[in-house]
Amino acid sequence: MATYLDFEQKIKNLQDDIESAIISGDNDAISILEKELEKEVSSVYSNISDYQKLQLARHPDRPYAMDYIESILKNPYEINGDRHFKDDKAIVCFLGKIGEQTTMIIGEEKGRGTKNKLARNFGMPSPEGYRKALRAAKLAEKFHIPILMLVDTQGAYPGLGAEERGQSEAIARNLQEFAKLKTPTIAVVIGEGGSGGALAIAVADKLAMMQYSIFSVISPEGCAAILWNDPSKIESATKALKITPIELKKCGLIDDVINEPLIGAHRDKESAAKAIESYFLKAFEEISQDDNYLNKRYQKLMNYGAFS
């Protein structure tokens, strides 16, 4: 059953009415209701607020990394473990083909269903997850295989064990090593891009965001609690943080925005997957034809935070 957000209630009601009209065989009513639905969808999504985009980024039906991997990667071969401690299921690494291009995909996976979510720690990676990602990236570099990174986490796991095993070192190491990888790298924020937990697999030649994704140094709830001592001020915090793709592109922090189906990737996962596949192949072709891409990546990273 589809999940609707609070601002989509009228859309839900119209779709329910259409289903009832279909059951009763009232073709005239179906035609009228479909036009009303199209008008309502256009009205709602053409005036969507930053807070509503946050809700869409967190939508429970939104495609996760594994959804995209299963859709766009042919002949997938999974890489497990960091060769130091364990296999962190919050990070997934697969080697396969996108189109005819051999590709390494590294993604953050939140999981579906209670058991799977617990196994994947709700998409919050531990140090061994980031070390597994680096292991996969180094393997790709060895054979000059392009890397596609799918970013989707509320943040790195803040537990005591993760800190004891070097969470901050693992993130910092990835920032350093991914910046130097001698192979084309493309990162796409597909849902939530939460602070260092997202950055650890987001250093790339091209950094894009899905239309209804977010990227932030802190959650809006955390920001509201710190600045106003009131977590209920989440809407104000969301706007102030400028966490949406449009705002981040204006600031020069991301390269591109990937358009989603009108009412979100969760309503048409196949189209969303095709959009990511198309973006990756186009970006890879552009990067691979540029002999100076490593220097351009370095210059891009050095320009972060610089304003004239």
Swiss-Prot record:
Signal peptide bounds: none
Domain of life: Bacteria
Pathway listed: Lipid metabolism; malonyl-CoA biosynthesis; malonyl-CoA from acetyl-CoA: step 1/1
GO cellular component: acetyl-CoA carboxylase complex
Annotated function: Component of the acetyl coenzyme A carboxylase (ACC) complex. First, biotin carboxylase catalyzes the carboxylation of biotin on its carrier protein (BCCP) and then the CO(2) group is transferred by the carboxyltransferase to acetyl-CoA to form malonyl-CoA.
Family annotation (NCBIfam families): accA (TIGR00513), AccA_sub (NF041504), PRK05724.1 (NF004344)
Family: Belongs to the AccA family.
Protein name according to UniProt: Acetyl-coenzyme A carboxylase carboxyl transferase subunit alpha
Organism: Helicobacter hepaticus (strain ATCC 51449 / 3B1)
Lineage: Bacteria, Pseudomonadati, Campylobacterota, Epsilonproteobacteria, Campylobacterales
